[in-house]
Amino acid sequence: MATTKYYGTGRRKSSVARVYLVPGTGKITINKRDIDEYLGLETLKVVVRQPLVATETVDKFDVLVNVRGGGYTGQAGAIRHGIARALLQVDSEYRPVLKSAGFLTRDPRMKERKKYGLKAARRAPQFSKR
């Protein structure tokens, strides 16, 4: 028996998350590890669950995630984006709720490149008057 899988791709900074929603009990698995084991900070766990809480589907789906690149914050944002996109495949009536909360928008903010003559993107070398 083939169970229905709903797929969504999420991106944030340099992280890319491939998210699958499977009808289940609400278990979230990231890179074959439980969410509590993978994400240490409670705030990141809240970020990941936001789309499910907004659409009141926390205990209706198991979330399987494969995420690569970036740090934990970027990965949590990418997972949130992916879950929101996958929820649209489940039911398109979730769109107004997810859109108003801003979960469907790809956050365009990226790391600014380092410029030559400077120590970092904008940090200049110390100025000496004399």
UniProtKB/Swiss-Prot annotation:
UniProt entry tagged with the keyword Disulfide bond: no
InterPro entries found in the cross-reference section: Ribosomal_Su5_D2-typ_SF, Ribosomal_uS9, Ribosomal_uS9_bac/plastid, Ribosomal_uS9_CS, Ribsml_uS5_D2-typ_fold_subgr
Gene Ontology molecular function, alphabetical: RNA binding; structural constituent of ribosome
Short name of any one Pfam family annotated for the protein: Ribosomal_S9
Matching SUPFAM superfamilies: Ribosomal protein S5 domain 2-like
A cellular component annotation (GO) from this entry: cytosolic small ribosomal subunit
Keyword Membrane recorded: no
Keywords: Ribonucleoprotein, Ribosomal protein
GO biological process, one term: translation
HAMAP family named among the record's database cross-references: Ribosomal_uS9_B
Sequence similarity: Belongs to the universal ribosomal protein uS9 family.
PANTHER family, per the entry: RIBOSOMAL PROTEIN S9 (PTHR21569), SMALL RIBOSOMAL SUBUNIT PROTEIN US9M (PTHR21569:SF1)
Name of the protein this chain belongs to: Small ribosomal subunit protein uS9
Organism: Agathobacter rectalis (strain ATCC 33656 / DSM 3377 / JCM 17463 / KCTC 5835 / VPI 0990)
Phylogenetic placement of the source organism: Bacteria, Bacillati, Bacillota, Clostridia, Lachnospirales
